[in-house]
Amino acid sequence: MADSSCGKKSTKCPHCSSASQKNALCICSCKTKLSPMSVVEMSQTSSTGSSEFIVSPEKRKEKGASKDVTSGKDSPSKSSNIERKPSQQQWGRGNFTEGKVPHIRMDNGAALQEIYTFGRILGQGSFGMVIEAIDKERETKWAIKKVNKEKAGSSAVKLLEREVDILKSVKHEHIIHLEQVFETPKKMYLVMELCEDGELKEILERKGHFSENETRWIIQSLASAIAYLHNKDIVHRDLKLENIMVKSSFIDANNEMNLNIKVTDFGLAVKKHGRSEVMLQTTCGTPIYMAPEVINAHDYSQQCDIWSIGVIMYILLCGKAPFMASSEEKLFELIKKGELHFKNSIWNSISDCAKSVLKQLMKVDPAHRITAKELLDNQWLTGNTVSSARPTNVLEMMKEWKNNPESDEESTTDQRDSRSGQEESKVYQPSRNVPDVSNSSDEEEGKQVGRTNKTCRKNNCFISPNCEIPSQHLEHFCNSFFVVGL
């Protein structure tokens, strides 16, 4: 790798290909001054070698102006002063699967002033800040995250490096885009996509809460991003309103806000190695968004992100968190119980289907929690439902019937009205096998296929055979439900 110190090792001039003079100014015989930003390397999408660049200060100029070292006069620049050469050594930290992100190593950050015009501060932390910047050559706006590695400490720097590695490896319309990285011995600069509308949390605070349709669009985008990450075995682990940025927004004809969101801040994100069953153990995240299994310090998987999506959706709909308490200890107790309430009057205008989605997202047991992919296919999210959603599995139907038997009685009344008086009076007894509700011809047909197949008396459809789960409901493929004795 080329030495970044011009005084110690000669390099080739990008203009004339001759060796530069061995002096502090690093001036070539063709009178071109070389930049202190002498080595630029590209993080690769595979394990192949990287590319090194030697960059002159004229590589980027505002409106194409450059300065001659000897005359001091400005002269137009017509070409990019970059020389590429192969390298056997790769400076990147790992192999990536999505596009190339330049990772530029410098002696100091002064060279950035040649590339960007810095503007307002967008955010500030204990050891870094985010600044709006304009690329002088392309006249494009970016958000540059500047981190002081010395103040951050080794542990925080490791998290930052992991964040950079993950951002280099992803490409999705609803995940923040990393354009390039500049790094000095003391600082790191992440040039990222600028989201001019700010944090989703700020917009929520101004609105109070979002409508159901507005929330649906946000959750669609969020679910798409998380499904993409989970498919790549990446777990975000810190999903919250503050970590969802808004690139742009508009008000549609129905006076509803449409937001183009971007998931950001991958400081706690981790890429799992191995099969999807691999579990995580580190307790991390923001308390009100943390899943029960994370609080319990149990092994957990990417399903912790799904719980966080549920919390976000709940807050978007009503403006308040699902669980609130006077102390963190009490808050964690509420989260571990996972009892959702919809007592606020706002919930009167929210569909039962949306509430059902919330319940599926916030199952205390992660094994029963809906996945990101399943969420994308959910009828409420796709907009393919016009009525209240009903549970899709036997266990959920059992719970619904126990909590609200009146609703089930209403649904079965219509079914009984369509049957004969004799069929209305039938009482079905629970059994590990499907109750005998078919005639002899049905039984003979079942014997032919070697199992106890039955037929629905309502629509003559096939009934799922030999269910191993003791239940109060039987589900037919025609979506008819028959209540049996408890």
From Swiss-Prot:
Domain of life, source organism: Eukaryota
This enzyme's EC code(s): 2.7.11.1
Sites where the protein binds ATP: 122-130, 145
Protein name: Serine/threonine-protein kinase 33
PTM field: Autophosphorylated.
Biased composition (Basic and acidic residues): 57-66, 413-426
Pfam family name, one: Pkinase
UniProt lineage: Eukaryota, Metazoa, Chordata, Craniata, Vertebrata
Subcellular location, record wording: Cytoplasm, Perinuclear region
Annotated catalysed reactions: L-seryl-[protein] + ATP = O-phospho-L-seryl-[protein] + ADP + H(+); L-threonyl-[protein] + ATP = O-phospho-L-threonyl-[protein] + ADP + H(+)
Keyword Nucleotide-binding assigned: yes
Functional summary from the UniProt entry: Serine/threonine protein kinase which phosphorylates vimentin/VIM. Therefore may play a specific role in the dynamic behavior of the intermediate filament cytoskeleton.
InterPro entries linked to this entry: Kinase-like_dom_sf, Prot_kinase_dom, Protein_kinase_ATP_BS, Ser/Thr_kinase_AS
Occurrences of domain Protein kinase (ranges): 116-381
Residues where Phosphoserine is found: 407
Biased composition (Polar residues): 41-53, 68-80, 428-440
Similarity annotation: Belongs to the protein kinase superfamily. CAMK Ser/Thr protein kinase family. CaMK subfamily.
GO biological process, alphabetically ordered: mitotic DNA damage checkpoint signaling
Ranges where the record places region Disordered: 39-100, 402-451
Active site: 238
Subunit relationships: Interacts with vimentin/VIM.
Disulfide bridge positions per record: none
Keywords: ATP-binding, Cytoplasm, Kinase, Nucleotide-binding, Phosphoprotein, Serine/threonine-protein kinase, Transferase
One of the record's GO molecular function terms: protein serine kinase activity
Gene Ontology CC annotation, any one: perinuclear region of cytoplasm
Gene: STK33
